[in-house]
Amino acid sequence: MAVQQNRKTRSKRGMRRSHDALSASALSVEANTGETHLRHHVSPDGYYRGRRVIAPKHGDETEE
């Protein structure tokens, strides 16, 4: 196994880890229904950018 030659300081460790932070997912609000969804993804009711692109699997919603 590899063993480090010199100990890394807290500063160097922190500088390396500074890029590891997670950011929150960007959410969009659908214009027609007001439902939230991930960017560039179809909303749960089948709308994308104001148009219905997928019919819902459960048949209880009416077509508009």
UniProtKB/Swiss-Prot annotation:
Where do the record's region annotations for Disordered lie?
A: 1-64
Determine if Cell membrane is one of this entry's keywords: no
Spans of biased composition, class Basic residues? 7-16
Alphabetized UniProt keyword annotations: Ribonucleoprotein, Ribosomal protein
Q: Biological process (GO) annotations?
A: translation
Q: Report the GO terms under cellular component.
A: large ribosomal subunit
Which Pfam families does the record associate with it?
Answer: Ribosomal_L32p
| One Gene Ontology molecular-function label | structural constituent of ribosome
- The answer on whether this UniProt entry bears the keyword ATP-binding reads no
Q: Which HAMAP family match?
A: Ribosomal_bL32 (MF_00340)
- Family membership: Belongs to the bacterial ribosomal protein bL32 family.
> PANTHER family per the record?
50S RIBOSOMAL PROTEIN L32, LARGE RIBOSOMAL SUBUNIT PROTEIN BL32
Q: What is the protein's name according to its record? A: Large ribosomal subunit protein bL32
| Higher taxonomy | Bacteria, Pseudomonadati, Pseudomonadota, Gammaproteobacteria, Methylococcales
Gene that encodes the chain: rpmF
